[in-house]
């Protein structure tokens, strides 16, 4: 969402597939497009000077958007991919609806819902035409899209609903009984890294205790969020412990006593301090706890 784009190098898909990695995109990047880095370069390459990232603009503009999404699906069709459906603005901005701006109140909300349902149908059609098989598809009811979902937006049963935390480690909402019964199931988008206005960001140092993360994810599991877990980690190196913990918890979740000794084990194996201790113990120069 914030840097580079997976599609920029065609070999990325093959390498990820070779390593057993399932690739997906965030809540604002549909059908494997990283809009912040792909939309404008793609328009320039195609020579489209009047297109906008807004599905409310009918006619040729919609056809250009469908072409943009379709080419991404074609590039990744041979790999294991999670496709995000729906639409928000470029780079985590709001849902663009310039053709609906004259509407107000409930009329505007109904028009937004109808538009988003149309977008999802058209995206599903692209996937069916290009893949000819079922694949993992997600929908993220987040920010302004959550309001539309709560007011009647119909999301196809096979789509996995991805719920988010509040950016500070607390899961805001669990699926209700009806949502738990969905064919596509439910997932979570959890932050160990957050890019926000000054004073709120924590990009490279996680401020959420692992014990709190465990409690929140355990409650999520117990409330039916069991299909897909996504962790926002920002930089890889500073959050190695959190990444390892998240992955191991996802593997063991549901088992009695899962992950109660993980932090101690990880510390003994992975930290520079313990590596120094092991080497010093061999020389018997001092004792380490």
Set out the residue ranges of the language-model regions.
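Feature activates predominantly on carbohydrate-active enzymes
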Residues: 1-63, 140, 152-167, 177-209, ...
